[in-house]
């Protein structure tokens, strides 16, 4: 296909086989502009395209983050306000987004539909090279920042990125890592916050914003990535004929020079703490250590392994020593590899100020001893086995595999390395095992962690008042600024505000919308993807088999029924799931168990999961999951049986350490994913399943952890956990799921596992009921909030799925995100009948609740308009069928099984969507009008905003 050296103006520089992917990587350069391109040619139906630009910040205004948002707000060919949203509405994409990194901006898409893939690629190319930002300053003001003058003269700032970063800066981890990068890279672009510091975002002018696009978004500074079964002749023809031929060669932004070593000393950063938290034990100590260069793969992988061996869990050698000494609640170590010179962050979390010095001394003493006396070779071998499994598995979770691979390609390519250098595993671990015998890892401890001339320390200082002081400071600055303006300046701001309001409130013309490429409904299969499931019985236990190619890996899940438990017991089982695999068993101490698990398992995890298909019933499961190579599944399931059968729950130190860590982690999770917390909490007022999930994974579980931590009675807790383990872990009520290809060794291992388990007891009881409708608020330390409102609707079907998509993208996106300044928003429609709306990083939660109340009115008017909804149908179907790995397909099949959703039911819902009409939407609007009369409400926000939400009750995180 690529014979010859020139194709549509592209010279093929070389082609390199990638046997692990059964692929060939072609490396090309566009001769006229210098644009570089790689294509991983392989038989992969999910095609990926991405275009990346090295974007090196020169200040903290977040200009490249704002550009990332803004170029997707209209272009020369696609002159609609938000092509990105139109694509969300109308495409069958498996990925559609854009990303700002500290030194690059990346615009990737993927799709299983070849026509859709080309459509998406065209829109993205026009967006980055020909955006409407030069014609429409309103784009900058909407996505970046702008002033707003209220009728009473009160001045405020708004903007999507501005509010996003206000929320990000409520995260202590974000503040800590920003401080480390400022300290370690004082002479490079990495010292700046690429996402933007809210204090500095308002310093960015429209003119400077445009200048950065001119300088950095040229074909000569672009890198294109392709993966999969791509029609390369068509793609190169589009690139050259429609875009690159119109550009001359320009300047390629050089790779930034490496930072010379600096000893930055100690930095102190204040962060906001929830009001009920005692600040005395909430200091953090973080070491920042530059680890080398990102293109040095052996060294970077070795540092990942060191992170695991030293601090991978509570039994890892450095963490264990620190916790035993009472120095910190948790100790972690990670490789931060999003830059040319990755750094190690070694953190001791939740410690008193008077112990900071001792913590630093203890870290040095333990690391010094390890460097001198050597690491446990068995621990290193286990860590290598586990990391090699993960790297060869290439399961990137939310990201499609082609996109996940692209991150490694760009890491090497944009920093002067070969694009294929980080793609395959090859002999990497053979090299590391050989170097292990030469003392390589001990030398890294010395050179990177102990004697590194390129280092800093950051102390995070907790404060109850920091957030309020900042908000008062901002308010006074805005008040002073407004008072200093002349009437002409006020008029200019009001004029810009009016222009922005008019633009945001305007509709795209039919001609502009028609120009956007889109699929026809006839391009969409009426058949949803089927997840193969065969239900068998083995030893009285239900066995679900999902026969799927999985590269020689088996995925085994055990589901122990806990449906009848009450709230307190469900929370205790959820905490039990945190302990399993982390505490001693009758056969092995926790440290040895951890080593064996890493050696023999790709993954071993435990959780509590809730499945429902109606408002008044649900199924709750204690879930155990294991993945391993088929050849090693016997050892893996043997370890799982040991953990389930004989975990020791009576070790006070280990259990209370995990309790405190989980409580802190849950607090951070509730703040960072407040929209999930809010919508889940609202749903729990109305339906039993969400109420059970609150006790298993939500705010009720967090409150249970707080109570256990505040008034510890270890004997009672240990006794309850042991009694629950005996009650729920057994063959009675158990369902086992196996995903992978048929394999006798797997069948034998599963049979042996079941034989090793006790019979168990029946878990009976009334379970957990819905909490009852109310308007509740949870105070969080943040400048932005998360608002949710919902109600129980009629029977879930394809009409409701379509209506949720229409409300999300035709109404909430514009009203809450575009005009309201929230970073995210949407409507969910769930199989249990719950229908609700949420917002994310929202500066005006109270106003947003009012917008939700008008959803029925909007939907009724939309249906009456007779709008063409074919594209929205396409997008709704796509949203319900994401790209899944074999592992994820098995888990989705289990989910459907427990909810009682058959393939025929899914086919019927798809048929309902494909046949959807405005009359269907009108019918849903009438139902929404009725159910939204008394909805459930939950808002997570700062205290002042909660006071504007007319709430019945307020608690504090």
What is the predicted role of each segment?
Residues 63, 67-71, 576:
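Active-site His/Glu-centered metal-binding helix of metallohydrolases
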Residues 41-43, 50-52, 162, 166, ...:
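His/Glu-based metal-binding/catalytic segments typifying zinc-dependent metallopeptidases
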Residues 73-74, 196-222:
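A conserved hydrophobic secondary-structure block that centers on an alpha-helix together
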Residues 46-56, 82-130, 137-148, 174-199, ...:
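M16 family metallopeptidases and their MPP-like homologs
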Residues 443-530, 681-779, 910-911, 915, ...:
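Long, compositionally biased intrinsically disordered regions
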Residues 158, 210-242, 717-752:
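Non-catalytic, conformational "gating/processing" segments within enzyme and secreted inhibitor domains
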Residues 1-48:
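Non-catalytic terminal extensions that flank enzyme cores
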């Amino acid at each position: 296909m690529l014979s010859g050296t020139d194709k549509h103006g592209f010279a093929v520089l070389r082609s390199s086989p990638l046997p692990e992917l059964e692929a060939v990587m072609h490396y090309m350069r566009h001769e006229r502009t210098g644009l570089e391109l790689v294509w991983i040619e392989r038989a992969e139906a999910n095609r990926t395209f991405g275009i990346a630009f090295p974007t090196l910040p020169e200040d903290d205004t977040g200009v490249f983050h704002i550009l990332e948002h803004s170029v997707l707000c209209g272009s020369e060919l696609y002159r609609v306000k938000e092509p990105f949203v139109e694509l969300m509405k109308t495409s069958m994409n498996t990925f559609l987004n854009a990303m700002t990194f500290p030194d690059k901006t990346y615009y990737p898409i993927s799709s299983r539909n070849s026509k859709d893939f080309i459509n998406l690629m065209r829109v993205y190319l026009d967006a980055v090279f020909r955006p409407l930002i030069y014609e429409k300053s309103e784009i900058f003001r909407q996505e970046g920042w702008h002033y707003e003058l209220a009728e009473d003269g009160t001045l405020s700032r708004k903007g999507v990125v501005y509010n996003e970063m206000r929320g990000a800066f409520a995260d202590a981890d974000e503040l800590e890592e920003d401080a480390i990068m400022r300290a370690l890279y004082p002479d490079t672009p990495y010292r700046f916050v690429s996402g933007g510091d809210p204090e500095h975002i308002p310093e960015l002018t429209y003119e400077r914003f445009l200048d950065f696009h001119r300088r950095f978004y040229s074909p000569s500074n672009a890198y294109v990535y392709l993966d999969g079964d791509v029609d390369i002749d068509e793609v190169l023809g589009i690139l050259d004929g429609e875009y690159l031929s119109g550009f001359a060669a320009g300047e390629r932004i050089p790779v930034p020079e490496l930072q010379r070593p600096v000893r930055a000393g100690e930095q102190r950063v204040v962060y906001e703490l929830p009001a009920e938290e005692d600040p005395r034990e909430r200091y953090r100590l973080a070491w920042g250590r530059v680890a080398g260069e990102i293109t040095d793969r052996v060294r970077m992988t070795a540092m990942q392994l060191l992170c695991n061996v030293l601090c991978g869990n509570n039994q890892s050698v450095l963490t264990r020593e620190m916790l035993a000494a009472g120095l910190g609640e948790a100790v972690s170590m990670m490789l931060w590899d999003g830059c040319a010179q990755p750094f190690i962050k070694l953190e001791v979390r939740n410690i008193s100020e008077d112990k900071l010095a001792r913590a630093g001394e203890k870290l040095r003493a333990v690391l010094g001893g390890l460097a001198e006396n050597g690491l446990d070779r068995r621990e290193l071998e286990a860590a290598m086995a586990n990391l090699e499994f993960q790297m060869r598995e290439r399961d990137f979770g939310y990201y499609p595999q082609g996109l996940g691979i692209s991150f490694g390609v760009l890491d090497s390519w944009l920093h002067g390395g070969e694009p294929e250098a980080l793609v395959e595993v090859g002999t990497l671990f053979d090299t590391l095992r050989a170097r292990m015998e030469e003392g390589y890892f001990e030398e890294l401890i010395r050179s990177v962690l102990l004697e590194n001339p390129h280092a800093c320390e950051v102390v995070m200082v907790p404060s109850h008042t920091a957030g309020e002081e900042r908000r008062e400071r901002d308010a006074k600055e805005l008040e002073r600024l407004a008072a200093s303006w002349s009437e002409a300046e006020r008029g200019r701001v009001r004029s810009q505000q009016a222009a922005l309001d008019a633009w945001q409130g305007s509709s795209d013309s039919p001609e502009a919308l028609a120009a956007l490429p889109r699929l026809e409904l006839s391009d969409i299969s009426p058949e949803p993807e089927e997840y193969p499931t065969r239900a068998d019985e083995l030893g009285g236990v239900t066995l679900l088999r999902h026969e799927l190619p999985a590269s020689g890996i088996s995925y085994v899940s055990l589901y122990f029924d806990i449906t009848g438990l009450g709230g307190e017991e469900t929370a205790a089982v959820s905490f039990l799931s945190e302990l399993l695999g982390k505490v001693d068993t009758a056969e092995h101490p926790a440290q040895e168990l951890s080593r064996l698990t890493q050696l023999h398992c790709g993954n071993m995890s435990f959780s509590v999961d809730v499945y429902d298909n109606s408002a008044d019933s649900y199924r709750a499961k204690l879930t155990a999951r294991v993945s391993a190579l088929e050849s090693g599944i016997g050892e893996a399931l043997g370890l799982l049986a040991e953990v389930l059968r004989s975990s020791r729950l009576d070790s006070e130190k280990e259990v209370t350490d995990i309790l405190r860590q989980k409580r802190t982690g849950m607090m951070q999770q509730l703040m960072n994913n407040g929209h999930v917390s809010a919508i889940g909490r609202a749903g729990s007022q109305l339906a039993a399943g969400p109420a059970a999930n609150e006790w298993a994974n939500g705010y009720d579980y967090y409150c249970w952890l707080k109570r256990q931590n505040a008034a510890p009675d270890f004997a009672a807790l240990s006794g309850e956990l042991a009694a629950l383990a005996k009650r729920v872990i057994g063959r009675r009520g158990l369902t086992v799921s196996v995903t992978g290809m048929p394999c006798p060794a797997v069948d034998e291992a599963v049979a042996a596992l079941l034989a090793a388990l006790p019979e168990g007891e029946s878990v009976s009881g009334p379970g957990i009921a819905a909490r009852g409708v109310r308007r509740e608020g949870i105070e969080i330390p943040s400048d932005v909030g998360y608002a949710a409102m919902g109600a129980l609707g009629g029977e879930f079907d394809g009409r409701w799925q379509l209506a949720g998509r229409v409300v999300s993208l035709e109404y909430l996106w514009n009203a809450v995100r575009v005009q309201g300044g929230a970073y995210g928003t949407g409507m969910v429609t769930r199989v249990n009948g719950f229908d609700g709306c949420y917002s994310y990083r929202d500066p005006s939660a109270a106003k947003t609740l009012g917008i939700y109340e008008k959803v029925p009115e909007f939907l009724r008017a939309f249906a009456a308009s007779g709008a063409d909804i074919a594209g929205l149908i396409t997008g709704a179907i796509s949203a319900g069928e994401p790209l899944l790995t074999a592992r994820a397909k098995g888990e989705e099949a289990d989910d459907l099984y427990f909810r009682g959703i058959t393939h025929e039911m899914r086919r019927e819902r798809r048929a309902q969507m494909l046949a959807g009409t405005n009359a269907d939407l009108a019918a849903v609007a009438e139902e929404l009008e009725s159910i939204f009369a008394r909805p459930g409400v939950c808002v997570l926000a700062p205290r002042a905003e909660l006071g504007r939400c007319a709430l019945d009750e307020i608690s504090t995180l």
